């Protein structure tokens, strides 16, 4: 017990320091989960050996994973996913999956069929549950980029989890996995409908949960954790992926609870999860990363990073350009949305942990894949800056003009260089103005919210102009009197 408490204290210390380190980077472009994973790998048995596996920490880690994906499941709106944007998000994920399967076959990684499937699925994921609070913090809700993340990102989390549940049970055939999965879904639907009926009937238990939701007993929060733990236990008994059980708990809560009550409850669940269990999940899961194995094969690591970007970001960007509801989005918003949908580190951690546990993937390869996920998150800010510069200079237009009139190539290059300098001056001026207003944005956030921020700035200038005009009119009127 003393050893476990000491390890937990160490983990929480690095969690606090990781959050502080993430806050020091202007615009906070790197999520703190990257720092959690780095801390776990550093403290684990393959590096410093400060923390090691234990039953108590393993249980806390499993609860953290459950709370993380319960929140993600609650944030998914099935009615929106059934709409046009959701269907297009599903089509995009299917394209990503086909590309990932082809890339996995070409790489010839020496994995079993289940291992190859797990690897391919990991390349197609989006950590939607992690992006939701990031969207909230960066005020992306209601923007075009936020809408894309809600459809494409949600499908990029839901469909990989379902695929993993079907393909990753070492003890059953795929047909048996599908049958068990259908049975599990039926049980969850029955629980949700039973909860709805109980809420509508308003029995004594329902009244107790509602009346004591804000008291010291926190009855509704306790009932929520009961639902989560019960579904995790059921999934373990049925040999299903625990991520699926956590998703199901979120779906049930969204269906049973009224919206206002659900938001209040979710805030408490997030406080419990983000305060303790979710960071422990990331640090503890990253503990098994074999740093030596990652360093021994840098070419494979670079290949995995490139695949994560090409297999997910590129198809999302092309689909946004192809489908009618997103075709007219500015290029910067498409780039930002595609790169946000590529952020998959938390789900990669969960999926590789499940794959290693099922014996479908060696721990060394899982280590490389998790590190690739972390590096892809680090690369995204660089790519957004490159994209912002490319959008400002219009290189395609410049190439077309040079091809049509080669003798004026120097003049064309000079014109586009001046355009870039002007765009850079405007970009830094706008960011400086936003910083004075207390808003700090990364390049990805700037691309996502550029139009909205310009409109807001223009409205503020108009307001100031009208206010000054009104004050001048009042001053003139007072002088006349």
Predicted feature residues:
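Structural signature of hydrophobic alpha-helical transmembrane segments
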Residues: 1-13, 32, 53-70, 112-128, ...
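Helix-coil boundary and interhelical linker segments in multi-pass alpha-helical membrane proteins
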Residues: 1-6, 45-56, 102-116, 164-179, ...
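Transmembrane alpha-helical segments of multi-pass membrane transport proteins and ion-pumping complexes
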Residues: 11-19, 23, 37-41, 45, ...
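Transmembrane alpha-helices that form the ion-translocation and gating core
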Residues: 24, 82-141, 283-288, 296-391
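Membrane-interface junctions of multi-pass transporters
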Residues: 24-28, 42-88, 204-304
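Small-residue-rich segments of transmembrane alpha-helices in multi-pass membrane proteins
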Residues: 34-46, 90-104, 150-165, 209-230, ...
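Membrane-interface helix-loop-helix junctions at boundaries between adjacent transmembrane segments
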Residues: 107-121, 130-178
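Membrane-interfacial segments at transmembrane helix termini in multi-pass membrane proteins
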Residues: 192-214, 252-271, 309, 313-343, ...
